[in-house]
From Swiss-Prot:
Cellular compartments per GO CC: cytosol
Pfam families in alphabetical order: DUF179
NCBIfam families in alphabetical order: PRK00228.1-1 (NF001266)
Protein name from the UniProt record: UPF0301 protein HDEF_0602
Family, similarity comment: Belongs to the UPF0301 (AlgH) family.
Amino acid sequence: MNLQHHFLIAMPLLQNTYFERSVIYVCEHNENGAMGLMINQPVARFTLERLLKKLNISSVHDAGHLNKPVMSGGPLSDDRGFILHSPQSGFNSSIHVSDDTMITTSKDILKTLGTKKQPKNIMVAVGYTGWQKGQLEQELIDNVWLTTKADTEILFNTLIPNRWYEAASKLGINIFHIAQQAGHA
């Protein structure tokens, strides 16, 4: 089972935890573990514009686009930035996640924000979520997460508060109708 380019959708049993109602985009999943970014937890009052100012990158032409919030990608390395975007070459540190998505960790992509060189779709996160070997698989057995193939419409264009519900809807379920506790038969 490889969950790269899938969503992990937090089950209701994660209520009152860091991952309550979270949707995680899995960027990498292999025999050594997994890495992903929460796509629906904005950092309070932290926009792309504020990020650029903090990094001393001058704002460019389309400042309206810079009002997008920066996401909290997860509790690990919250001093590091990760940029999910539609495929586009020319950045120093980019990896293809899927045919529709790349992840870049170099600052050169930030200099394109608001210019014609900016990728069509973009989401910036600080921090990430990670699992050691076998940890994610055990969480799936324990009914912590639902999984579905990622959808770039949800990833880049769905309103942030709606992403949890919409990701679960891809499975044909209403997440609000799922019990907080699950059992095993």
